Swiss-Prot record:
Forms an efflux pump with AaeB. It is found in: Cell inner membrane. This is p-hydroxybenzoic acid efflux pump subunit AaeA. Keywords: Cell inner membrane, Cell membrane, Membrane, Transmembrane, Transmembrane helix, Transport. NCBIfam families: PRK10559.1, RND_mfp. Induction: Positively coregulated with aaeB and aaeX by AaeR. HAMAP family: AaeA (MF_01544). GO terms for molecular function: transmembrane transporter activity. The lineage of its organism: Bacteria, Pseudomonadati, Pseudomonadota, Gammaproteobacteria, Enterobacterales.
């Protein structure tokens, strides 16, 4: 009888342990697969594509690749002598038309004072018309001068914000055309994370929720806040034919891949971010509050580590 009880006890204990292990593993698996997290996340930043508004030879390059620059700092200079001459020519035209307008104004005023008693109405109208024509030419010359002044100012290309010069591909002596991108500027303190969350995990993602960001290959955990969730993504399975009818791609009903939706996360401390834009990371949305590691169970800690390195 005792032997039977002993065997039964061992069997019961084994079954209980197996059930507990199964429950623990199942909970860990659910936590790992269904809670809001993703390894498909990337550091991003605001990037300004800097292109000149004038064409000409590059006469001076004042920066080097990956240099940190301040707002207003000169990056490079384009053929100033040519645009200086254009400004001087425009200024001369303005001076000429100012003198001419003064002469025509005096002539028209004299004829208007004398009136039809001294000359015909046609001569008076002609003087007034000539004055108006000269005034229009003066206005055009002034606009040309202002444009030449603006072009001269824009021969000096300055940094629009604090940031890092990257992909610098211009050199002294090269000819650059208006509108062609010369360099990219990664704005300082503009870094954020784009986490591509599966649609099945969006239930636990809300603006204002806290998030943990672990860069690939690093144990350092950065903190952030969910800033926004994208309002839509492209439907790759639906297109239009040449008649405007919808074309829907066939799919397997028992295999449905979850769509990924971009979630923008704002970093708490910009100064601590040393990861370039475009590098990858793991993101875990912890909810309204930061995760308290001291209260995590062993399985949750293991699941969290799997997220980072799995």
């Amino acid at each position: 009888m005792k032997t039977l009880i002993r065997k039964f006890s061992r069997t019961a204990i084994t079954v209980v342990l197996v059930i507990l292990a199964f429950i623990a593993i199942f909970n860990a698996w659910v936590y790992y697969t269904e809670s809001p997290w993703t390894r498909d996340a990337r550091f991003s930043a605001d990037v300004v594509a800097i292109a000149p508004d004038v064409s000409g030879l590059i006469t001076q390059v004042n920066v080097h690749d990956n240099q940190l620059v301040k707002k207003g700092q000169v990056l490079f200079i384009i053929d100033q002598p040519r645009y200086q001459k254009a400004l001087e020519e425009a200024q001369a035209d303005v001076a000429y038309y100012q003198v001419l307008a003064q002469e025509k104004r005096q002539e028209a005023g004299r004829r208007n004072r004398l009136g039809v008693q001294a000359m015909s109405r046609e001569e008076i109208d002609q003087a007034n018309n000539v004055l108006q024509t000269v005034l229009h030419q003066l206005a055009k010359a002034q606009a040309t001068r202002d444009l030449a002044k603006l072009d001269l100012e824009r021969t000096v290309i300055r940094a629009p914000a604090d940031g890092w010069v990257t992909n610098l591909n211009v050199y002294t002596g090269e000819f650059i055309t208006r509108g062609s991108t010369a360099v990219a500027l990664v704005k300082q303190n503009s870094f954020y994370v784009l986490a591509y969350m599966e649609e099945t995990k969006l239930e636990g993602v809300r603006p204002g929720y806290r998030a943990e960001i672990t860069p690939l290959g690093s144990n350092k955990v950065l903190k952030g806040t969910v800033d926004s969730v994208a309002a839509g993504v492209t439907n790759a399975s639906s297109t239009r034919d040449d008649k405007g009818m919808a074309t829907i791609d066939s799919n397997l009903e028992w295999v449905r891949l979850a769509q990924r939706v971009p979630v923008r996360i704002r970093l708490d401390n910009q100064q601590e971010n040393i990861w370039p834009a475009g590098t990858t990371a793991t993101v875990v949305v912890t909810g309204k509050q930061d995760r308290d590691e001291s209260q995590d169970s062993f399985f949750r800690k293991m699941a969290h580590r799997l997220r980072e390195f799995g």
